[in-house]
Amino acid sequence: MLLRLRSKLGIHRVSCEGNDNFGSVIEKWANQLRLNVDPDSVSVSTQPGVSKLMTEIAHQGVESLGLRHGDMVTVEFKVLDTEEKNVSEKEMTNMTVSASTTSVPISSSHNKGSIRGKVKESALDIELEGETGLIPRSRSSLCRHGEKGMCEYCSPLPPWDKGYQDEHSIKHISFHAYLKQLDEVTNKKSSGSSYIPPLSEPNYEINLNCAGGHEPWPKGICSKCQPSAITLQQQSFRMVDHVEFQESELINQFIDSWRTTGMQRFGYLYGYYKRYDNVPLGIKAVVEAIWEPPQHDEQDGLTMDMDQVVKEVEDTDKLAREMGLERIGMIFTDLTDTGLGDGSVYCKRHKDSFFLSSLEVIMAAKHQLRHPNVSKFSETGLFSSRFVTCCISGNLNQEIDIATYQVSIEAEGLVEADLISGSTHPSQAYINETNDKRYVPEIFYTRKNEYNLTVKQNAKPAFPVDYLLVSLTHGFPKETDDDSTTTANTTTVFKTVAGFPWTNRQAMGQSQDYTELKRYVYKACTGNDLAELQAKLSNFHFLLYLHSIEVLNQQEWSLLIRTVTAPTLHEATEPLLNLINSPGWQTFVMILEQSM
């Protein structure tokens, strides 16, 4: 729990446990401020006008004093030596919490916006944070008021309303609905106290720098440095609600690798995040392109040279950012043909087997940890991830289908602390043993027994991996009623998905070379149809290959990016004409003319 200690130096937070002696809390607070406090002068109070000497209550537990998480305690004290441990105001008001990818400054002063002003969130998050997300309701038969009135039967519902979830079959509420629900409980508007970040990431690692006066693990351990027991629960919210593939041809081209070779395939999803109005305050991941890293495909899996993959992924990420895209997820196949000749595949993933294997869950958690979500409502400035995982496999009708998932924040914590590993049973995650480098606490999970009663069960040696899964919905842009074209056709980044070979498919007999380049784009380059040329250029894999041959300089490449990402031909015309008249483009056309 966190206690807020108010003194003449401001308000400071101290982390503690309910059974800690209150004297240790004051000691932590004094060490935090680097003060040489006279212990006989310290008095504390939780109510105005009622104070107690520290010497009287130092031995009592925090909870026994009636203190709860977030409570404010007023501290009065005298300093023995004001010159000892000279603390500047800057040192007292600024602390830095380091995360794996960034450092987020967090102020410990009484300023209510301490964390909020120092973390740069996405425009989407800022937009959703500014909305209430209230669910409107029309008048019902129980209403007894006029048209302009409102009562409990027709007043708007909060975005986390359980009844609305059940009625619309929403298994997980959106992240921002969960955040508003949590923030309402943690920071009540009537209290007027300093702001407490409602989000915190679980930390299941043992503290190797414990101040308890003992040797670090494995030579010593105490209740303060060891992680508490873990009870696994289904996560009630999801960071992303929906995955939208801008073109069905994206999936068709990706599956073609399996159709051609019978081998499995893996790829990364590139796109962006957008609001999703089908759920209150929802977010969807919009997939614009799939990029396949170098891999050696097999019938039951695949292998990769990670050094090569990391280098190529970094280069692809950089080019994608120039196009306004980011790596938002991963996708892989698990397909086995039935041999009936009708295109049917075996259904291997269902409620009686598994949805994601334990190894796949761990892989998803590692990817999510590498792509953290920035949030000013978190203690560290980071909270979970929006990285999604998609699996293409057979459904119950033996048809090829897509399933989309994330793993819970508990899964991220378990993987980061190295507490779980894969097992021979894909539906079970194995709990690692305690060793010199890690301490494994007790892990439990709840389940329904044969009497339909909820019971808590010890998770060792393994537990169902479904407790770590968060399911998402998926689909394609809906067709409009007026012209029967997809709504994505006016907003999609890339106009063409097929036609030019995808990257890293040499083993399938699909190479990217000058011959393929000429076949794909030469006619459009030498013609007079600007719309056709823009559509041909607007191809993710064509752009990656064109960049690799280094025929365009940086200015010409920028013109090309402006051309292919322009939403309309009118906006693309000017940069396209400038590109056509550039020396680099003329050289490119000459290379195509001389190619076989």
Curated annotation (Swiss-Prot):
* Membrane topology per record: Peripheral membrane protein
Gene Ontology, cellular component aspect: endoplasmic reticulum membrane; nuclear membrane; perinuclear region of cytoplasm
The UniProt entry, under CDD domains, shows: MPN_NPL4
- Indicate the segments forming the MPN domain, all copies: 243-383
* BP terms from Gene Ontology: mRNA transport; protein transport; ubiquitin-dependent protein catabolic process
Location comes to:
Cytoplasm, Perinuclear region; Endoplasmic reticulum membrane; Nucleus membrane
Q: Is Aminoacyl-tRNA synthetase one of the keywords UniProt gives this record?
A: no
Q: What is its main location?
A: cytoplasm
List every stretch annotated Disordered: 88-115
Gene3D superfamilies in the cross-refs: Phosphatidylinositol 3-kinase Catalytic Subunit, Chain A, domain 1
PANTHER family annotated for this entry? NUCLEAR PROTEIN LOCALIZATION 4, NUCLEAR PROTEIN LOCALIZATION PROTEIN 4 HOMOLOG
Name-wise, this protein is Nuclear protein localization protein 4
Q: Which organism is it from?
A: Kluyveromyces lactis (strain ATCC 8585 / CBS 2359 / DSM 70799 / NBRC 1267 / NRRL Y-1140 / WM37)
